[in-house]
């Protein structure tokens, strides 16, 4: 296996037994592909597919005027270049977006043309600006108003038809009432439902119900047609002396004989007996075609058609009439030879439609349409046209109704049709098919659907949601355009004047800015970013709501297997509604989730990979990834554990059709990062995967010594580390940028063969954590494409590194680890292991006020010199200044209104000048509880406002950086060109040149070194071909110089132009503070197995328990946290971590003892090739082996993949190899007494995380502060600088102690007794420590509320 540049430096030992058939796919594919398909920016304008923006335009255009003589057609669209790049947008608080321009064609037809023919009179084409469309960054996020946001995919109910029942809840009898619902992608919902009396009703858009036959009549069906569609018939002939019924023996089975069945005077079935299959066979054998039936048998049956007296033409009976004795007499009298009755029975041919027709009062199509109109538009008088229009618009016009391709596919599959394509609207056959299927289900043939099945729920990603929003915007525009089109011809308008793009832009802006699914990106660490982009939510517009979602929707469904993670979901009200995509899952063209499987043929597992959606998966038998295979890939066991039709069963190898691709297939990225996940209880695994997302990046990242092997993928795909775009050699490196000279074979002609990577330095993330990148390469290193060049936050040598590997001991320690508390050693704090940097952004805005402009300056009234010492002459703090609470960061003065002055003030003003008093100090100060270092200052100035000195300095520095980048590109390109020129010229005959080069002289290197490089192009050669090549090179160099100039000009223009600020803002200063947070008691820590706790105490190193060799442990955890929580994974991690660390120390000792390289190789071979996947180190040079050993000193990283990890024996073998006790336990000594503890203690290394719940952010105290306006009580919470609530239960406590005076004080002067607290303040100032309590304000509020109920309440004072 080939290792990348960083992988070589530190190889993980992998305990996985199963080969990796399929690499983990790029983790952000869903987001990127969806939006790419929406924009189709990379496709030419005439080659776009009918999806995304293109489809949205095509559905709304052409817009035709009311008269039909003018139409506006859509031709194509194009996206411009964004003005600012991603980083600039973040700094300036702008949206990263590209202008959208649409080419429209206005076609005017001749009004006077003869009817039926259209003559084009005029065509105008014009490009119209349609607002800006936000672009997705390469990491799958959007920058909206300067903040990074993610649009979460939505899991919603797929369009199509669904059959269900009410689970017996509607009616008290517990009878199951079946229903069918047709859900379109857009348009009205159509529901059919049974009532307890077995009639079928229809609802449109959940309005009041109508008999279902009303809808059928509205479609133009007559009673007879309806009956013929839904029922089979029996034919009855009227004979001289009775009635003969055509006999279909199959229909008799299971019925009770109402009369004696006679065959040739032999009674086959007696009256009152049930007809069995034997009787049916006998009847069939007898070959009887008809039976004589008594009249009583026919009474109560229903006629299938209208019966007309042929002689007189008189209507004898209507279709669906019930047969009575009178009717039979009438029929006989009218001379009717035969008639048909509906065949129904109570088992599987219910009379539902017939009973529905009986309650249906409509008799004609028009009546039915009017009835539907009344239901949809109550209170409006119906007309024939209105009723017809409304009905046709409901389900039969493309503008109002669309099933979508998915909906049509699901619809056709469900009603049992072969083809899966068709129109987006419904037709008569569709509605009949739904009704027939519903009746079949009611008759007991067929199953209801499971709406939580992932074949009935689909994923709506960014692109699709953006398209819908865009379409909505366009529809709003359409209405306005239609009205203006009528005047377009007379006034000679152009498309530009017809279209107002504001509604479109507003709809798009609203969606990206404030939709429920457009979320502020969780940027705590790279894992939380990746997870956020892979999240799938059932909430949001068109989805569920928290309150209405029941248990079933939230539950894990068998179809989640390999598609949605069963573990990772939030705790709390959203549990189960927000899920994460499984590692290998992807969405198909229809939006259903698919997961990959290996094909199995005749018991042999192939490497052919097939993606199956939940719909297809049910019909196959699928083996699990851990099924035993022999060397040839045949399934070995006689019975293999597998899944079929959503059930877990056992099956023989020959029946198996597919096999899982990997054991980690079923979990999400976060869960796949938990080692020994298979040994943890699911609830704790859920907490573990959620808490990894809250880990704060530490100052020095340290990758987990026990990992799962997926860490590198996550780190690279998250985009937090920098990956080489093309291979090459490192030309220069410093902390802020890396310059790579690209390999010749990877550059295209004419482009500079240089890649410059600017590193992100100390930037603030959305969660105020610090994003910082550090280079990993040195000058001269050879890189390949995809190698990691720089680590980001929480990555270490290109691997995810969320926390620190700590030496832990499981033992109680003086009660300081009671209830999950965590005891840590002072050494951890001293070594800054869990120190993190947090960056706060503070903003100062200078506005234009009524009294004059606010000013940013260092000239602030009544402020001491010492407070101004950190400001420069512009009044802005220096970068690098260390600031404390209440220090001034930006000096700002605001004009103050004129006030009446006392004579003394007038005198002072006369003596000391005006300035002091007409402005007040409104400077930006450091908030309380925050101290740190200023790391960056940004000044934004409105156009037309002079820039101050500081702004110009910042601008100059930015320009210098741009210039440096461009110069480096040019330098490398020049070097490359001159190298090629030298190769071209040396050794060839010249025809003349600078420095008196003679004709016929051979050009030498010496000659070229004497001539300045710029003059090499003046050399003329004998061969014309060489001269041509020289000219080409000279031209391309000139071209690059020009390109350099233009790019520099562009950048300069961008930097020097004024900023786009909010109205009324003249200047804005942003100051960034870096705050160092050390570990302290009260901070929350956690492992990766849901084992969380709060730091209770930091203990001096000398008091911590220590090992026999004197090593003190770092952390002491409570052993009682393991048994009841059932997360044993943490113990196994601890054991393996100890082995890994021990092996690293052993390698370190060997290196220090200057062991031979061969010995090192042998030892490494023992470690890596002990079991499972082999690592071949023979290709490594000695130097690489030494580098590897140096990196392994801190511990040999291990990977134990989920569900395929290290086994107990392997852990023991590793401990043995590291010369550690195989039990994983050792004797510890008490640091305070030096005595050994009674029993051996489990000790080892665990990867611990510091979570973003820091005591500094939560601790809060109030002396005086704001009060609520109505109740006059102090506000609550840290954000409002509120007080501590002395609540109901606290009052009980004081009452219980009888502390009446303390209680009175709490409820009055310390809370909301306004007079009392003012009086008390006065008393304290006067040194008089008495208090008088008055009526608290909240009592007055209560009195007012009671009075508002018209109950008078008064306070009588004695």
UniProtKB/Swiss-Prot annotation:
UniProt-listed SUPFAM superfamilies: beta and beta-prime subunits of DNA dependent RNA-polymerase
GO biological process, one term: DNA-templated transcription
Record's keyword annotation contains Transferase: yes
InterPro entries from the UniProt entry: DNA-dir_RNA_pol_bsu_ext_1_sf, DNA-dir_RNA_pol_bsu_external_1, DNA-dir_RNA_pol_su2, DNA-dir_RNAP_su2_dom, DNA-dir_RNAP_su2_hyb_sf, RNA_pol_bsu_bac, RNA_pol_bsu_CS, RNA_pol_bsu_protrusion
Record-linked PROSITE patterns: RNA_POL_BETA
Keyword Transferase in annotation: yes
Organism domain of life: Bacteria
GO cellular component entries: DNA-directed RNA polymerase complex
Catalytic activity: RNA(n) + a ribonucleoside 5'-triphosphate = RNA(n+1) + diphosphate
The entry's keywords: DNA-directed RNA polymerase, Nucleotidyltransferase, Transcription, Transferase
GO molecular function: DNA binding; DNA-directed RNA polymerase activity; ribonucleoside binding
Enzyme class: transferase
Pfam family, one: RNA_pol_Rpb2_6
Record-listed E.C. numbers: 2.7.7.6
Quaternary organization: The RNAP catalytic core consists of 2 alpha, 1 beta, 1 beta' and 1 omega subunit. When a sigma factor is associated with the core the holoenzyme is formed, which can initiate transcription.
NCBIfam families from the UniProt entry: PRK00405.1, rpoB
Function: DNA-dependent RNA polymerase catalyzes the transcription of DNA into RNA using the four ribonucleoside triphosphates as substrates.
Family: Belongs to the RNA polymerase beta chain family.
Protein name as it appears in the record: DNA-directed RNA polymerase subunit beta
Organism from which the protein derives: Thioalkalivibrio sulfidiphilus (strain HL-EbGR7)
Gene behind the chain: rpoB
